[in-house]
Amino acid sequence: MSTSPKPVAPIHVIGGGLAGSEAAWQIAQAGVPVVLHEMRRDLPSSSGAVGPTKVRTDAHQTDGLAEMVCSNSFRSDDWQFNAVGLLHAEMRKLDSLILSAADQHQVPAGGALAVDRDGFSAEVTRRIEAHPLITIEREEVAGLPPEDWDSVVVATGPLTSPALADAILELSGEGQLSFFDAIAPIIHVESIDMDIAWRQSRYDKEGPGGDAAAYINCPMNKAQYEAFIDALLEGPKAEFKDWEHVPYFDGCLPIEVMAERGRETLRHGPMKPVGLTNPRDPTVKAYAIVQLRQDNALGTLWNMVGFQTKLKHGAQAEVFRMIPGLQNAQFARLGGLHRNTFINSPRLLDRSLRMKVAPRLRFAGQMTGVEGYVESAATGLLAGRFAAAERLGKTLDAPPPTTALGALVDHVTGGHIEGEALGKTSFQPMNINYGLLPPTETPKVGDDGVKIPMKERGRAKKRLMSLRALADLDQWMAGA
C-alpha cells in the first residue's frame, strides 16, 4: 500500500518589497510553498470612519508589492562595463522576477534600466498573487516570528517595524546601525519649459530601448549655478533630532548635503555638464546641467536625477524653480527623508545569509548591508534559493566570489571583518562594484590581437571580469 508523500512545510517571507518578492518567487519556483507577509494593507472602514484605513510605512504610498520609493531606476544595464549591469545579467540567468518585471515595464533612460513604477509594482503583485504556491498574508509580524516557523526570510527593508527591529536587535545583541535615505522630487512634464530644456542622453548613449535622448536637460550658467547653491545652502531643512548622529550613505546623499561639502561638488556630481550639448547654443558649454528622467510609461512624470533632498517642502518648490526650464514646474511629489536600518551582517550572518544564533532566520535586502534596488533583490534571490534548497534537503553553496552575486555575499558576510585589521571598524552599506570582485590581470591585447591603448585598458579589464563572472555563474548553476 503506497502512502502519499509528506507535504512540504511552507517557508515564511516577511516583507513584500523587492527582496521579499524575489525571495518568495525563487522559493515557489523551486516547488516549495511560501507565505509572504506584508504589513501594508487597506483596512475596512470602522464604525464612524470615512473610507478605508491605510496601513503604510513612512515612505510607501501604496500597498503594492515591490513598490519603488527612492527612484525608478535600476541603474546601468551595461553588463560588459558596469557592475550593476553585470548583476542584472546574472539575475536574468536565474529567473529573477524583479528583472523580468523591470524589462517588461521599462521606460526610456539612456543606458540605464528604468521602469514605470506603478506598472512594475502591479506586475510583480500580479505574478506573486497568481502563483499557486504563494499565499499573501496582509499583516504585521510583530516581534520575532513564532517558533513553529522553522524557516523564515526576513526582508523587511529599511523601514522595518519597530517591534520586529527591536526583537532582532535583542536577539543579536548588536546595536542598531542606520543612515538617512532621501527621495527625489517628481515633476509633471507639461510644466517643463522645453524652449529652455532639451532632450539628450549623456554622450548620446542609447539605452535598452534604443533611445539616445532619454533625459530632459536644464542648463545653468555660472551666475545661475552660484545663486542656486546659495539658495540650496540657505533653505530650511527638515530636522530629525533622533537621527542627528546617523551617517549618510554616499550613494544617496541629499543634494544640500553634497553642496555643503563644497560649492563645486554638485557640478562634478549629479549636475555635471559633460557629454551634453545645448542644440540652441551648441558652441557654449553649460556650467552645470540638471537632468530629469522619465518616471512612468506615459511619460507624464519625470524625476530630478540625483536630487534627493531633506529641504522643507515649501523651500523645495522655491529653490528648484530657480533652475532654468523649471521656473513653472508643477511637482507631482516633493522630496523627503526617511531612515534606513541595517544589521551588522558580517558578525551575525553565515554565507547562506542565516543568523548564526538563530539559523531558522535568514535575512535579505537592505537590512543585510547592501544598498540599491538591484542589490536588495539579488540578496532576496539568493536567500530564497538557499531556503528552498535547505527545505528540500539539498546543499547549495553561495555563487563564487568572481560573480557579482557571490561578491555581494562576500561583502555582507565577511568583507568587514577582514577590514577591521586595517582600522575599519564600522560595517557600511555598499552598492555592487568591480572592487568587490577579485581582480584580473589588465589585458594589454584585445581579442583581435591588436594592442589595447593604455586609456582603454580599464574598460577592457571590466569586460574581462564580466565575462569571467558569467562563465563562473554558468558553472555554478550547472552544479547547483
UniProtKB/Swiss-Prot annotation:
Its EC number is 2.1.1.74. It comes from the Bacteria. PROSITE patterns: GIDA_2 (PS01281). FAD binds at residues 15-20. It is an enzyme of class 2 (transferase). Disulfide bonds: none annotated. Its cofactor is FAD. Keywords: Cytoplasm, FAD, Flavoprotein, Methyltransferase, NAD, NADP, Transferase, tRNA processing. GO terms for cellular component: cytosol. Pfam families: GIDA (PF01134). It catalyses: uridine(54) in tRNA + (6R)-5,10-methylene-5,6,7,8-tetrahydrofolate + NADH + H(+) = 5-methyluridine(54) in tRNA + (6S)-5,6,7,8-tetrahydrofolate + NAD(+); uridine(54) in tRNA + (6R)-5,10-methylene-5,6,7,8-tetrahydrofolate + NADPH + H(+) = 5-methyluridine(54) in tRNA + (6S)-5,6,7,8-tetrahydrofolate + NADP(+). InterPro entries: FAD/NAD-bd_sf (IPR036188), MnmG-rel (IPR002218), MnmG-rel_CS (IPR020595), MnmG_N (IPR040131), TrmFO (IPR004417). It is found in: Cytoplasm. Belongs to the MnmG family. TrmFO subfamily. Catalyzes the folate-dependent formation of 5-methyl-uridine at position 54 (M-5-U54) in all tRNAs. HAMAP family: TrmFO. NCBIfam families: gid_trmFO, PRK05335.1. This is Methylenetetrahydrofolate--tRNA-(uracil-5-)-methyltransferase TrmFO. It comes from Caulobacter sp. (strain K31). The lineage of its organism: Bacteria, Pseudomonadati, Pseudomonadota, Alphaproteobacteria, Caulobacterales. The gene is trmFO.
